[in-house]
A protein has these predicted regions:
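Basic, amphipathic alpha-helical bundle interface domains used for macromolecular binding and assembly
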Residues: 34, 40-45, 60, 67-77, ...
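Peripheral, non-AAA+ core regions of ATP-driven protein-machinery
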Residues: 1-213, 218-225, 324, 460-463, ...
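Conserved alpha-helical scaffold flanking the Walker A/P-loop in AAA+ ATPase domains
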Residues: 204-206, 257-263, 268-296, 328
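Alpha-helical scaffold elements adjacent to nucleotide-binding pockets in ATP/GTP-utilizing enzyme cores
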Residues: 47, 51, 84-87, 122-126, ...
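Walker B catalytic acidic pair
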Residues: 293, 299-301, 311
Length: 486
């Protein structure tokens, strides 16, 4: 007799639903698993036999063949233990268990208990895509709280409990533990910002339009504090976006707590290019992937190696990075927002006080950052000490709601394709001609102007919006090298 059940396996952050077929027939007792199982899957045979015994369930006598579909995909890990056991129970019809489309994900212990697994966030997106609506896990399994609304949840303590619930067709929707819910970002501590009204407006523009930013200034001027506070302005992710983020975060941190807040990654300047990009035999995500849909914060950007910074070119352009995993090219998501800080020179005081650096040293210092990376940064802003003492203007918290509204407006109007008025077109054309702007400069100025208009609640981009955008990204004067040595 044939029985089947649905399980799942994970490859990196991707999940594949597996259809487990079991055939129990006459013949010499033998338990075979086919369908490209690795050693961890094959070891399930011993765990399943013992789990049946301790659950008080008769283990079928005769020839047992288990097939894992699709057979062409290599199966690894212990996620399939419970699905294999349920398929065997259904094939043996002792006890009789109805077939359904529930996905079973748990490891079996020798005493029949269900062992929770790490990294299940990706299952939600895969099950939804394939039209599956019921999930069975351990009672101790931590799951993202959106699962409670997305699926019928069946939680069981052991194999005997699974059998009881399936025979009674009871699918219990149980709330995930409250510890999985992260408090809104507005309740978190935000470093106090004294003054900085110009910089706060700039941060709001960057947050609303996902513009990249490099802040240059002397030590102690506040650029790092501003960079740290930037994430406070970002709106929450959607549930689908948060599940996608969690799928990758759980690879690096199995104890990752699900949250709607965008991730913020702050790698040390000694990190290698491999550490930024990820890859390797096990498909480990790098910092650019862990910052997907969030912020990659590079404090003291010029202390990073030239090779590490140059590695950012592809993910900044494509929003993804192609890595080699087990000899196969694999695309990792890397749509991050770069926020960086830097000193103007090795001593840190060029243009801000008594600088002891020779011009040649300053030029050599800035050559640590590849020109193409600087060109891809939307705004290079110099933070002055005088600016840091200015008072007035909206507070950081006051900008949060404006950024949220501007982000929604940009999304509803297809973002950067908002209409420029005739006057705005003329201002943009004349400025770009006068300043010999490149096509990239022109595109970035138009995008900045669109964001500025959205912050004011406007669909149409007006001339003043373009004029402000030109101030933030002035073609021909963005080079920190030029500004630092003059």
């Amino acid at each position: 007799m044939l029985g089947y059940a649905f399980g799942a396996i994970r490859h990196g952050a991707d999940v594949q639903i597996v259809r487990v077929q079991a055939d129990v027939g006459p013949g010499f007792p033998r338990f075979t698993i086919v369908g490209l199982p690795d050693s961890s899957v094959s070891e399930a045979k011993a765990r399943i036999r013992s789990a049946f015994h301790h659950a008080g369930l008769p283990f079928p006598k005769g020839r047992i063949t288990v097939n894992l579909q699709p057979a062409s995909l290599k199966k690894q890990g212990s996620w399939l233990d419970l699905a294999i056991a349920v398929a065997i129970l259904r094939a043996s019809a002792s006890p009789s268990i109805p077939h359904d489309s529930t996905v079973f994900v748990a490891e079996l212990s020798l005493d029949g208990g269900l062992v929770p697994q790490s990294g299940l966030s990706a299952i939600g997106l895969r099950m939804r895509d394939e039209g599956l609506s019921s999930l069975c896990v351990s009672t101790d399994q931590r799951l993202p709280w959106p699962f409670d609304n997305m699926f019928h949840m069946m939680r069981a303590a052991d194999l005997a409990d699974v059998v009881t619930q399936l025979r009674q067709s009871q699918v219990h929707a149980v709330r995930s533990p409250a510890r999985n819910v992260t408090l809104p970002e507005t309740t978190r501590f935000v470093p106090p910002l004294n003054g900085h009204p110009v910089e706060l407006r700039l941060l709001a523009i960057c947050a609303a339009g996902r513009h990249t930013l490099l802040m240059v200034g002397s030590p102690g001027v506040g650029k790092t504090t501003l960079a740290d506070a930037f994430a406070h302005l970002l709106p929450d992710l959607t549930e689908d976006e948060a599940l996608e983020v969690a799928a990758w975060q759980e690879i690096a941190n199995p104890d990752y707590a699900f949250t709607l807040r965008p991730p913020v990654r702050r790698p040390h300047h000694a990190i290698s290019a491999r550490g930024l990009l990820g890859g390797g035999r096990w498909g480990t995500p790098g910092e650019v992937t862990l910052a997907h849909r969030g912020v990659l914060l590079l404090d003291e950007m010029l202390e990073f190696s030239h090779a590490s910074l140059n590695a950012l070119r592809e993910p900044m352009d494509r929003g993804a990075i192609e890595c080699t995993v087990n000899g196969k090219p694999t695309l990792f998501p890397a749509s991050f927002q770069l926020i960086a800080t830097a000193n103007p020179c090795p001593c840190g005081y060029r243009g801000y006080g008594d600088c002891s650096c020779h011009d040649l040293d300053v030029r050599r210092y800035w050559t640590r950052c590849p020109g193409p990376i600087l060109d891809r940064i939307d705004i290079v802003h110099h933070v002055n000490r005088d600016t840091g003492r200015e008072q007035g203007g909206a507070s950081l918290d006051a900008w949060v709601e404006r950024v949220r509204e501007a982000t929604a407006l940009l999304a509803s109007s297809s973002g950067r394709t908002s209409t420029l008025s005739d006057d705005a077109h003329r201002v943009l054309r004349r400025a770009c001609d006068r300043l010999r702007a490149s096509e990239r400069d022109r595109e970035k100025i138009a995008a900045l102007a669109t964001t500025i208009a959205a912050l004011e609640g406007r669909d149409e981009v007006l001339a003043p919006h373009v004029e402000e955008a030109i101030v933030w990204r002035r073609p021909g004067s963005l080079s920190p090298v030029r500004n630092a040595i003059t």
